[in-house]
C-alpha cells in the first residue's frame, strides 16, 4: 500500500485524469467541485461518512470560560456580556471564506453595537496562537475555528449556539457584499471516504473494510493532540490508536482479522 499525502481537490483531479489513487480517505465534499461529476460519471463510489458527525465550523469559547460562565454558550449570552469574552471576536484572515461568513454573522448579530469587535487576524498562525495564549493565561477568547483540528485537541473548546442553520441563507452569508446577512450556525460539512469504481470491483474485501472506518471529531482531535505532544509520526499514531481503541476498530473487521491484529499488538 502506498500512502500519498493530498487534499480533496487535487486527489479528485488525479482520479479524473489518471484513475488514481484507488482510495481517498477524506473528501470534504463542500469544497470539492469535481466530487458530484465524478460520482455521476461512475468513476468513484462513496463508501461512508469518515467523520460521523461531519466537519464542524463555528464560533467557540474555551471550556474553562464556558464552565465559569455557562451563559456564554449562546450568542445572546455573549452579546449581553461582551467583557467576558474580551470584547472581541477572533476572525479568520482576509481571503478565507470563513472570514466573510463570520463577518456577516457579526453584522447580522450587531456585534459591534454590543461591544464585540470583529478582529480579523493577519494569518492563520496568529489566529491559532491567540487561542494558545488565551489558554496559557486562562483569559477570555471568543472566535472562529473548525474541527477536527490539532488546535481543538490541544485546547478544548465549546461551540457557541448561533441558532439553527438555514441553507437558503448561506449563499448570502458567504458573499462579502451580502446586503441581508443572517445570524445562524455554519452547516456541518459532509466528509466521506471514496474509492474508484475499478478498485471496488477488484478489491471487495478492502472496500468493505474502508466502508466501516468512521471516526468522531473528538476522536480525531485527541489523536492529533497526542501526535503533537509525543512528536509522533503518522505510523506511530496509528499504532497508538490500534493499541488504545480496540473496541472501536474491532467493530470494523471480522473475527479472524480482529484476533490476528490483536495478537500483533501484544
Model-derived features with residue positions:
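Pocket-flanking alpha-helical
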Residues: 7-43, 126, 130-133, 150-155
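Extracytoplasmic/secreted envelope proteins and their assembly/folding machinery
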Residues: 9, 13, 32, 75, ...
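Solvent-exposed loop/turn segments at secondary-structure junctions
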Residues: 9-10, 29-33, 65-67, 94-98, ...
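Ligand-binding pocket segment of bilobal, Venus flytrap-like solute-binding proteins
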Residues: 21-25, 97-173
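A conserved helix-loop-strand patch within extracytoplasmic ligand-binding domains
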Residues: 44-95
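A bilobed periplasmic-binding-protein/Venus flytrap-type ligand-binding module shared by bacterial periplasmic
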Residues: 57-67, 189-202, 223-226
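C-terminal lobe and pocket-closing loops
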Residues: 149-214
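C-terminal functional modules
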Residues: 207-266
Amino acid at each position: 500500500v502506498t500512502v500519498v499525502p493530498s487534499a480533496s481537490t487535487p486527489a479528485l483531479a488525479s482520479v479524473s485524469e489518471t484513475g488514481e489513487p484507488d482510495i481517498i480517505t477524506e473528501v470534504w465534499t463542500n469544497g470539492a467541485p469535481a466530487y458530484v461529476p465524478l460520482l455521476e460519471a461512475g468513476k468513484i463510489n462513496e463508501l461512508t461518512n469518515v467523520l460521523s458527525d461531519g466537519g464542524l465550523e463555528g464560533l467557540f469559547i474555551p471550556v474553562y470560560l464556558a464552565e465559569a460562565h455557562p451563559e456564554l454558550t449562546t450568542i445572546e449570552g455573549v452579546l449581553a456580556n461582551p467583557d467576558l469574552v474580551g470584547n472581541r471576536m477572533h476572525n479568520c484572515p482576509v481571503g478565507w471564506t470563513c472570514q466573510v461568513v463570520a463577518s456577516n454573522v457579526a453584522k447580522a448579530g450587531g456585534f459591534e453595537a454590543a461591544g464585540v469587535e470583529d478582529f480579523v487576524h493577519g494569518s492563520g498562525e496568529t489566529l491559532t496562537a491567540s487561542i494558545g495564549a488565551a489558554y496559557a493565561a486562562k483569559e477570555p477568547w471568543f472566535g472562529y475555528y473548525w474541527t477536527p483540528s490539532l488546535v481543538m485537541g490541544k485546547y478544548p473548546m465549546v461551540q457557541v449556539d448561533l441558532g439553527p442553520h438555514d441553507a437558503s441563507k448561506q449563499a448570502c452569508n458567504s458573499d462579502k457584499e451580502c446586503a441581508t446577512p443572517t445570524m445562524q450556525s455554519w452547516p456541518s460539512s459532509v466528509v466521506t471516504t471514496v474509492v474508484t469504481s475499478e478498485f471496488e470491483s477488484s478489491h471487495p474485501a478492502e472496500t468493505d473494510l474502508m466502508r466501516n472506518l468512521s471516526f468522531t471529531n473528538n476522536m480525531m482531535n485527541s489523536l492529533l493532540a497526542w501526535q503533537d505532544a509525543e512528536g509522533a509520526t503518522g505510523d506511530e499514531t496509528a499504532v497508538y490508536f490500534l493499541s488504545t481503541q480496540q473496541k472501536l476498530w474491532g467493530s470494523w473487521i471480522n473475527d479472524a482479522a480482529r484476533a490476528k491484529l490483536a495478537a500483533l499488538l501484544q
